[in-house]
């Protein structure tokens, strides 16, 4: 379930999980966040929502709104300070929380780039207009991304998200055209 969809009426409907708190950074209450992917959304957002990890010690079960004062990249992580986290003990208590950002605060992607969250739920058809299914997720294999497409019967197809196979993407219309047969 998306965070704002009935989970808590005060949560925005467009929250996207972008990382998790790895622990405290320094002695002044900064936190260290491991991004799930590109750190741009974390660096661009002015507010983060923290959701406690299941079974996380010393953290309330409620979401926490965290205004971001300063953030920067540091050795593959993002470190950030917030007026809501005054010292290292408070920062350390947030370890394990997942970090969520409003989709509206993501920086605009380049013309030929897409956020995974925008592709999930898209209908995928081939060039013959045969429906392959719906994008259920994406996989990064190190060389490129792979669309995980599931049809109505539960059959899963994996289609490389590369130009040779992906012919068009309409993010607003949630529609992707691929050069991929039903029998692949």
Swiss-Prot record:
Keyword Transferase: no
GO cellular component: cytoplasm; ribosome
Compartment(s) where it occurs, according to its Swiss-Prot or TrEMBL record: Cytoplasm
GO MF annotation list: ribosome binding
Gene Ontology BP terms: ribosomal small subunit biogenesis; rRNA processing
Major localisation: cytoplasm
Domain PRC barrel: 111-184
Matching InterPro entries: PRC_barrel-like_sf, PRC_RimM, RimM, RimM_N, RimM_N_sf, Transl_B-barrel_sf
Keywords: Chaperone, Cytoplasm, Ribosome biogenesis, rRNA processing
Subunit field text: Binds ribosomal protein uS19.
Function (record text): An accessory protein needed during the final step in the assembly of 30S ribosomal subunit, possibly for assembly of the head region. Essential for efficient processing of 16S rRNA. May be needed both before and after RbfA during the maturation of 16S rRNA. It has affinity for free ribosomal 30S subunits but not for 70S ribosomes.
Similarity comment: Belongs to the RimM family.
Domain notes: The PRC barrel domain binds ribosomal protein uS19.
Protein name listed in UniProt: Ribosome maturation factor RimM
Originating species: Ralstonia nicotianae (strain ATCC BAA-1114 / GMI1000)
Lineage: Bacteria, Pseudomonadati, Pseudomonadota, Betaproteobacteria, Burkholderiales
Gene encoding the protein: rimM
């Amino acid at each position: 379930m998306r965070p704002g969809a009935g989970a808590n009426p005060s949560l925005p409907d467009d929250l996207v999980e972008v990382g998790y708190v790895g622990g405290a950074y320094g002695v002044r209450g900064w936190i260290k966040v491991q991004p799930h992917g590109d750190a741009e959304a974390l660096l661009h957002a002015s507010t983060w929502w923290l959701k406690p990890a299941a079974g996380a010690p010393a953290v309330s079960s409620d979401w926490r709104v965290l205004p971001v004062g300063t953030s920067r990249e540091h050795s593959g992580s993002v470190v950030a300070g917030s007026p809501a986290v005054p010292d290292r003990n408070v920062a350390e208590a947030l370890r394990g929380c997942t970090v969520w950002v409003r989709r509206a605060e993501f920086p605009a992607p380049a013309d030929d780039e897409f956020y995974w969250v925008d592709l999930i739920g898209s209908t995928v058809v081939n060039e013959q207009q045969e429906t392959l299914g719906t994008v259920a997720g994406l996989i990064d294999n190190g060389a490129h991304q792979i669309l995980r497409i599931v049809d109505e019967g539960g059959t899963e197809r994996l289609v490389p998200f590369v130009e040779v196979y992906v012919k068009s993407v309409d993010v607003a219309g949630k529609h992707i055209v691929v050069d991929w047969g039903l029998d692949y």
